[in-house]
């Protein structure tokens, strides 16, 4: 269990759909999964993230951890893990996202954020760390996180959801940082925090 590097946009593992976590006939999960989950929590916490998908640290498995409020202004957070999540959402708006209310960032695009259109409500079903069924739903920031993390597991970054001038700004930012190529990562807690925490 340790803080590990987070892959940056351009790494193939971020752009490849993940594989389901194997579940035994008796409902058992892989014996090494608790160690991976602990590493994911520790890395997410060190990065001050609200969620972290396994492929962001190089594991092509379908699970994410989260520590997220329902609303940006609320102090109470929900924390947990979802294994093999299935996502359901309300309709995603087709209009331009609001720069004040729809801003979104990503640990794999460190220090950047862009307005991103997302459904206002989302639900995921899957398994918890013990292999028990879990269902999470929410609106606002929590719904945004559920969509963001499940998108990672499907091989997409939030940059892939951007439209118009926001998409163009993101492409310029990726190019200016020298991202978009394999092998780049950053280690939370080492050097300046790209998000200013």
Curated annotation (Swiss-Prot):
GO biological process: co-translational protein modification; translation
Gene3D superfamilies: Peptide deformylase
Gene Ontology terms, MF aspect: metal ion binding; peptide deformylase activity
Key words of the record: Hydrolase, Iron, Metal-binding, Protein biosynthesis
Function per UniProt: Removes the formyl group from the N-terminal Met of newly synthesized proteins. Requires at least a dipeptide for an efficient rate of reaction. N-terminal L-methionine is a prerequisite for activity but the enzyme has broad specificity at other positions.
Record flagged with keyword Phosphoprotein: no
Entries under Pfam families matching the protein: Pep_deformylase
Cofactor(s) annotated in UniProt: Fe(2+)
Binding residues annotated for Fe cation, in chain numbering: 106, 148, 152
Source organism (scientific name): Mycobacterium ulcerans (strain Agy99)
EC numbers on record: 3.5.1.88
Enzyme class: hydrolase
Active site: 149
Name the UniProt record assigns to this protein: Peptide deformylase
Family stated for the protein in its record: Belongs to the polypeptide deformylase family.
The reaction(s) this protein catalyses: N-terminal N-formyl-L-methionyl-[peptide] + H2O = N-terminal L-methionyl-[peptide] + formate
């Amino acid at each position: 269990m340790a803080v590990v590097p987070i892959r940056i946009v351009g790494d193939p593992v971020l752009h490849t759909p993940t594989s389901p976590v194997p579940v035994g006939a008796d409902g058992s999960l892989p014996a090494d999964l608790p160690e991976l989950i602990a590493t994911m929590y520790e890395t997410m916490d060190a990065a001050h993230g609200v969620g972290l998908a396994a492929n962001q640290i190089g594991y092509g498995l379908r699970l994410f951890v989260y520590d997220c409020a329902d609303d940006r202004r609320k102090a109470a957070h929900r924390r947990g893990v979802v294994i093999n999540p299935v996502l359901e959402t309300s309709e995603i708006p087709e209009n331009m996202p609001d720069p004040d209310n729809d801003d979104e960032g990503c640990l794999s695009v460190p220090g950047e954020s862009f307005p991103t259109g997302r459904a206002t409500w989302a639900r995921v079903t899957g398994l918890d760390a013990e292999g028990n069924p879990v269902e999470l739903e929410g609106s606002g920031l929590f719904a945004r996180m559920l969509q963001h993390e499940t998108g990672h597991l499907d091989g997409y970054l939030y940059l892939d959801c951007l439209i118009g001038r926001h998409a163009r700004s993101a492409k310029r930012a990726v190019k200016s940082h020298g991202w978009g190529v394999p092998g780049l990562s950053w280690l939370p807690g080492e050097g300046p925090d790209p998000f200013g925490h």
